[in-house]
Amino acid sequence: MKHLLKMSDLSPAELHHILDVAEELKAEQKAGTTPALLKGRSVALMFSKNSTRTRTSFEVGVYQLGGLGNYMNAATELQSGRGEPLKDTARVLGRYYDCVVWRTYRQSDLEEFAELAGVPVINGLTDYAHPCQVLADLMTIRERRGTLEGQKLCFIGDGCSMANSLIVGGLLAGMRVTCVCPEGYRPAADVLMFAHRYGEKFHLLTAPAEGVKDADVVVTAAWNTAPGTPESERRLRDFAGFQVTGRLMEGAKPDAMLLHCLPAHRGEEISAAVFEEHADEIFDEAENRLHVQKAVLAILLAGL
């Protein structure tokens, strides 16, 4: 693994290795024996979007592994925000840092940056992919279920970065994946092409009740990220009936898990009652961002 830009960069073996290392690092942290695997290493945390979990988990993770993490707001603190070409920023930061984490908009920009930087680059979220979040989701499922193989995962929501990454990650991990989106909100075409190679292990539906039937894990994410705008009003109409409620969860298995990448908009993509019922799972998932990202850093920079 040279970079982590999207889930399809990984083989099934690499995916499971990340989860194995993450579980080891989590156990070592709980025991107070975290190794200084990044001693003498520096990591640039370049963010073009606001962040709570991605920023803080990477900052803490680099510190716990003995490295130096520098946060920078790409829009307001770097010359890239005033027009410096991306290719110049990439080649400069690659001379200073051992690794760059970038949270940005266009996947194509991230891919170009990785080609030029000369150091490992990690996707902290783009409009196309969110691999760090999905690795945390898979870790949480494996911790609680003991295996990923054969588990039925149902994603309900917008066919955006979370859907794209869950589909690929779930299928690579041996899961059965159902994605439920309204018409007009399908996942990326290349993701669907990848998924259809898995035959009956993948289904794309528009009816939430059909999708959650006998699911082991239900996953949702915010789909209304610009409240008060015409786009928000349109999405509220288009996603009517896509809220994960107690009644909808009755169609899943009695012990089904519920995951949410956060932030959660209670009353929109998920009811407040269902969120609180599954809060332990959701906040385990949030914690596991720290552990999987430490694992990715350790693999890329320490050769684990």
Task: For the regions a language model picked out, list residue spans one by one.
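Positively charged, low-complexity intrinsically disordered leader regions
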Residues: 1-56, 60
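Active-site cofactor/substrate anionic-group-binding motifs, chiefly glycine-
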Residues: 42-43, 47-96
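Glycine-rich phosphate/diphosphate-binding loop of Rossmann-like nucleotide-binding domains
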Residues: 48-60, 143-221
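Active-site-proximal loop->helix
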Residues: 70-93, 116, 166-169, 186-200
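Anion-binding alpha/beta catalytic cores of soluble intermediary-metabolism enzymes, centered on
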Residues: 81, 98-169, 260
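Rossmann-like adenosine-cofactor binding region
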Residues: 196-273
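Adenosine-phosphate binding glycine-rich loop
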Residues: 255-256, 261-304
